[in-house]
Every structure is written in structure tokens, then in C-alpha cells.
């Protein structure tokens, strides 16, 4: 059950990160504080997406709390690296995102996935 909570946490955190990235690119910069505050108070689509992203992170923390009670810490923290993979893929696939493909990033994703497989695949016990 800890793995399920961990996967929920990773997926929710990834969606939250994408939401915050979208909101940050569409809201006025915080260097123009009054424009930024006015955009938040208008509670348009960008402000709502910002709020959903923040609430997503809060929900992700709850799932992470449940994960840490059910899953070994060494496995739980390795699971977090999946968020990098999900956000990278989503940034290239989702419309309006400007993620770019590179062999260097693909190599990084391959390393992350290889590490996760080493940690999570069952091992066979050898008898001596």
C-alpha cells in the first residue's frame, strides 16, 4: 500500500508542478507586485491554476506522509525521482508547454528509470 501512496504523491506533485509552471508563465511577474496581486484578486484562470497547484502540493504531502509510514525510506525517496521523468515528458507532450527533447535529457531519464528498476524489481535470493 505504501507504493500506491507513493505513486499518488509523485503523480499529484508532478501535476502541481506543471500547474505552477503554467501559472507562473501567465501571471504578471512578482517584480510588478501590484499587478501580480491584482491578478490574484481577480481570481481568473491563471490564479485558479496557481491555487490548484498549491493545493496539489499540499495533497501530495499528505500522500507522502502515508508513504513514509508504509514503505522503506530507501525505496520511498527513490520513487520521488519519477516526478522528474513525468514532468519532462509532460512538458514535451502537453500543448502550450515548451519542453524540448535532447539526448542528454533522455540519458538522464534512462538513468533514473534504470535506478528505479534496480531498487524496485524483486531479487532472487541465491543459496550458497
Curated annotation (Swiss-Prot):
Record GO cellular component, one term: plasma membrane
Compartment annotation: Cell inner membrane
Transmembrane segments: 3-23, 36-56, 76-96, 101-121
Keyword 4Fe-4S on entry: no
GO biological process terms on file: lipid A biosynthetic process; lipopolysaccharide biosynthetic process
Family, as annotated: Belongs to the ArnF family.
Reported function: Translocates 4-amino-4-deoxy-L-arabinose-phosphoundecaprenol (alpha-L-Ara4N-phosphoundecaprenol) from the cytoplasmic to the periplasmic side of the inner membrane.
Record protein name field: Probable 4-amino-4-deoxy-L-arabinose-phosphoundecaprenol flippase subunit ArnF
Species the sequence originates in: Shigella flexneri serotype 5b (strain 8401)
Taxonomy of the source species: Bacteria, Pseudomonadati, Pseudomonadota, Gammaproteobacteria, Enterobacterales
